[in-house]
Every structure is written in C-alpha cells, then in structure tokens.
C-alpha cells in the first residue's frame, strides 16, 4: 500500500536558459532583417535574411510560453494586477525614454535645417504611441514615432488578454 496522497510534480525552473538563448537569436535575426533592407546583398543572403522577419512571430510565441510558464506554475491563480504592473514596469520606461527622445528630435529638426514631411509627426499618432495602442488601430498614413514600438503595442494587447 502506498502512502502517497497525489501525483508528484517536478519543480519548474524559474529561468529557461535554453529558450532565452533561442530568443536572443530570434531577436538578432529580426535586427539583421531590418538592416538588410538598407544593404545590397547577393540574392541568397537577401532571401535568407528576408525570412528572418518570421523571428518576430516565433519570438511572440516563445515569449507567451515563457510568461505562461513563469506566471501559471503555482496552485493559486496569478494576480492579474501584479502581472500587468510587472509587465508595464518592464517595457514602458525604455519605451517612454525613446519616445521622448524622438519628440525632442522632431522638435529640434527644423531648427537645425532638417526638413520633415508636413504633418508626418502629429499629436494623434504620438498619443497612440504614448499609450501603446498604435498597433491596435493601424492606418496607412500613421506616423511611426518609434517604429519598432508596434511590437510593444501588440505585446501590451496580449498582456491585457492574458
């Protein structure tokens, strides 16, 4: 007769180092994809780097897996407010810093003789970027105050849905 009262669960590691390494290479692929748009490369290299844009999709999937692993391992359900606060604290300070820097550049540009497309950087698009909702309502004429921040907007949407 066994004195075990239930199934034994192996402890989950808090950090998934191999997956962190994979995320690094996915992010590197995305960076190289963006740079290859500016380079003249042989067709084979351009084709390979063009496919690296798929790293964003895999990065999102992997990040979702890691977040689920970290936040759903205990018996108790995670505290939704603490989850959102932790995610906000992780992504928003750097986002705000870059956005304010971009605002400064747009403000200074005419003073130093750099011409900007009329109406390109406007208050509506700035507000959407500030509140991380710019990817929720994309428009063809939308100004990219911080182009890569579309992914933060998509992440924030996923966090709210989590």
Describe the function of each predicted region:
Residues 1-162:
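Membrane-cytosol interface segments of multi-pass membrane proteins
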């Amino acid at each position: 007769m066994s004195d075990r009262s239930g199934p034994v669960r192996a402890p989950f590691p808090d950090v998934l180092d191999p997956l962190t390494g994979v995320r690094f290479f996915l992010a590197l692929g995305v960076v190289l994809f963006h740079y290859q748009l500016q380079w003249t490369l042989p067709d084979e290299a351009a084709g390979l780097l063009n496919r690296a844009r798929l790293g964003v999709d895999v990065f999102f999937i992997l990040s979702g897996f890691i977040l689920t692993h970290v936040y759903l391992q205990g018996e108790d359900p995670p505290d939704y407010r603490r989850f959102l606060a932790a995610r906000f604290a992780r992504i928003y300070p750097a986002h705000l810093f870059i956005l304010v820097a971009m605002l400064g550049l747009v403000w200074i540009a005419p003073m130093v003789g750099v011409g900007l497309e009329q109406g390109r950087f406007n208050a509506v698009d700035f507000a959407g970027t500030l509140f991380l909702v710019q990817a929720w309502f994309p428009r063809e004429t939308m100004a990219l105050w911080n182009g890569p921040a579309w992914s933060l907007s998509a992440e924030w949407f996923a966090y709210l849905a989590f």
